[in-house]
Amino acid sequence: MKKLLTAVGVATLIAAASAAWTLAAPAGTGGTKAEKSAHALPPLPATVKSRGRWVIGVKCDFPPFGYITASGKNGGYDVEVAKAFSRLAFGKGNRVSYVCVTTPSRIPTLQSKRVDIIISTLTYTKARAEVIDYSVPYYGATGRLLIPNNSNITKLSDMSGKTISTTRGSIYERWLHNCYKNTNVILTDTTSSALLALQDRRAAGFMYDDAFLVGVAANDPNTKLLAARFLNIPWGIGIRKGESDMRAWVNSRVKLMKARDQFWVIMQHTIPRRFYTTFKNNVPRPRNTLKYPTGPDPETICR
């Protein structure tokens, strides 16, 4: 019974976090004017054009980037980027179907051709870049650790001997494995399950992207974020290998949206005003270019 109540509490917390992030969608982002400007850019891939709509994989449990709203619709930053792609391709924001994906399922879903692309909080890694192509970056994330208010973890090295939850297949799984070998790790397929492990005290902390954890901490008076920030690595849109026409279209439109500062417009309509300062440098803007890391994989660099 206690576990059931805790699970219900986590579901409520996720819903509250989603509601806290939810704001009015940016009306007309990437609309007719952008469509005209995009006319001379690489053409829409034939498969998408003939279908008359996009099919895009997005997260459904990751506010404020991809989640299900109270009215049962897809919402979030990634979803608004998908709608902008729809406007740029077809002149309307509703020419897109969404497929819910999780961290471990998103690349297989892309490779099996169930979707055209994935806009799903996909952090760049060299290993992933060997099996799929990345677009130019469209967001820059930072890792954080969510802990109970009464936790004795004050720095990352305090995780030694403790149990930390995160999602399977995430960059945090590999970083913990490489750099914190004395830390036990609970791996889950969804963020809600990883959060549940923290809530029912199976885990001493939940490691994940700041964008998700800030919303949780803001709605749970029993938790807080450790001050340490780590693994500041951009996200890209996932594209199948060999689809050069798709890569050309996506990259050109991301660059167009960057030049028009449309990612910041989307972000402003995704997060509450009090978080503007926190996230203002997380999106590509005319004077803010995000770059993927070079050299050793960040998840192999310990601190």
Regions found by a protein language model. Give the residues of each.
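Extended ligand-binding regions for polar small-molecule ligands
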Residues: A34, A38-H39, V79-K83, R87-L88, ...
